[in-house]
Amino acid sequence: QVNFTPGW
């Protein structure tokens, strides 16, 4: 499981 949280 890959979680990507952008900062925008």
Curated annotation (Swiss-Prot):
Keywords of the record: Amidation, Flight, Hormone, Neuropeptide, Pyrrolidone carboxylic acid, Secreted
PROSITE patterns in the cross-refs: AKH (PS00256)
GO CC terms: extracellular region
Compartment list: Secreted
Tryptophan amide: modified positions: 8
Disulfide bonds: none
GO biological process: flight behavior; neuropeptide signaling pathway
GO terms of molecular function: hormone activity
Family statement drawn from the similarity comment of this UniProt entry: Belongs to the AKH/HRTH/RPCH family.
Described function: This hormone, released from cells in the corpora cardiaca, causes release of diglycerides from the fat body and stimulation of muscles to use these diglycerides as an energy source during energy-demanding processes.
Name of the protein described by the UniProt record: Adipokinetic hormone
Species whose genome carries this gene: Namaquaphasma ookiepense
